[in-house]
Amino acid sequence: MVHPEFPVVEGRYQMTSDWAVTLPQRFNRRIEDGSLVFWRPGITAWTVVWNNDNGESQQERLEWLRTDTSPDAFDAQFFTDGDVTRYSYRLTERRDEGVVHALHGFAIGVDGHVQMAIYFDDEADLETARAICRSLDETDTI
């Protein structure tokens, strides 16, 4: 059940003028600490959209992101989908309240990239997290 005091989004959602995401279920939406956050019980996606201010190629940005990846990362995936290069990896984080699973995903487009960290309590939500990352779509390129 989503929180009644926050906006609810589902399906295709235009995050910025350049990037959209498709959410497979109803999620609440908020802005927190400069991030766009989508959440529902058991799964939370923290999202930041970056511009390509330095005019770097997708490959240059991918290499930079790869060098900044945690040494604890596993299950890394790379692929190109149309004009978007995708990179993701998993982390398992141990916190005071227990184990939290995470999928960190990047969609690298012509004019920028999206960074998304999706945290989920139940390993069964991994496919939902992957579907959200795969749905990131650059909608307006110059």
Indicate residue ranges for each PLM-predicted region:
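Short acidic N-proximal helix/loop "leader" segments that mark the beginning
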Residues: 1-11
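Intrinsically disordered, low-complexity acidic/polar segments
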Residues: 30, 57, 98, 125-127
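A generic local structural motif
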Residues: 8, 23, 101-104
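Secretory pathway targeting signatures of secreted, lumenal, and periplasmic proteins
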Residues: 10-68
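Short, flexible beta-strand-to-coil junctions
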Residues: 41-43, 50-54, 92-96, 109-111, ...
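Signature of long, low-cysteine stretches enriched in small and polar/charged residues
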Residues: 64-112, 119
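Surface-exposed amphipathic alpha-helical segments
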Residues: 25-27, 114-142
